């Protein structure tokens, strides 16, 4: 029988479109609580344009803090929309990237 894998995206997807600001420390604490709950595959943040998604403007700080305060048994990934996002993520040590695209070229160009 095959196992079940949980890929948690809440620290990114659950926060990115909120209208109110979520503090960096709260994002880091959320990831820690998810790790404490036993999750081992967590999408931590998104390296998108900070003006388009203000709640992800602190992506570097969130990822760096999470990476420094966790065990090596947890896989942390990040969402990146383009090469600039990948470059920003790599600069803080990210190695697991989730990339999105759309069949709509206008959407891809805008994002």
Regions found by a protein language model. Name each.
Residues 7-28, 72-83, 108-111:
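Active-site mouth loops of central-metabolism enzymes
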Residues 2-8, 27-44, 51-57:
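N-terminal glycine-rich anion-binding loops that anchor highly charged ligand groups
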Residues 40-66, 100-111:
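Glycine-rich, proline-tolerant flexible connector loops at the mouths of alpha/beta enzymes
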Residues 14, 34, 89, 97:
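Conserved, mostly hydrophobic/aromatic
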Residues 35, 63-70:
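Surface-exposed amphipathic alpha-helices with a cationic face
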Residues 82-93:
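Catalytic cores of alpha/beta
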Residues 7-9, 95-105:
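Non-cysteine beta-strand/loop elements that form the S-adenosyl-L-methionine
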Residues 2-4, 38-40, 70-76, 93-95:
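Short, well-ordered coil/turn segments that N-cap beta-strands
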